[in-house]
Amino acid sequence: MALPSAWSVMRVVIPFISVLGLLGVRLVGASQDSGSVIPAESRPCVDCHAFEFMQRALQDLKKMAYNLDTRTETLLLRAEKRGLCDCFPAMH
């Protein structure tokens, strides 16, 4: 019976050791975090931050809509002016 080569054994052992190491680090980190719990009253309100972000985004959208509306109106006035000017022959 042929023995597995060192390379094939290492391909299995290294990922297995890595997974065990990550699980060990995660367990140690979880036990350290439990002592530093911040009370809910002193934590920033995630919903408040999301609301402020959405308010700023809405203000930006309103500004952009106003700018687009103004730009569209300017372009329409130019087109109307050009159309009116094309109707009248140039006076020389």
From Swiss-Prot:
Pfam families, from UniProt? Neuropep_like
Recall the GO molecular function terms of this protein's record: mRNA 3'-UTR binding
InterPro entries hit by this protein: NICOL (IPR028147)
Q: Which GO terms describe its cellular component?
A: extracellular space; perinuclear region of cytoplasm
Name the predominant localization: secreted
Name residues in a coiled coil.
none
Q: Which GO terms describe its biological process?
A: spermatogenesis
Give the encoding gene's name: NICOL1
Subcellular localization is given as: Secreted; Cytoplasm, Perinuclear region
Q: Which family does it belong to?
A: Belongs to the NICOL family.
In the record, which residues are listed under signal peptide?
A: 1-30
The record ties this protein, via PANTHER family, to: NEUROPEPTIDE-LIKE PROTEIN C4ORF48
Disulfide bridge positions per record: none
Name this polypeptide is given:
NELL2-interacting cell ontogeny regulator 1
Q: What does this protein do?
A: mRNA-binding protein which interacts with a range of target mRNAs and may promote extracellular matrix production. May function as a component of lumicrine signaling and may play a crucial role in epididymal-mediated sperm maturation and male fertility.
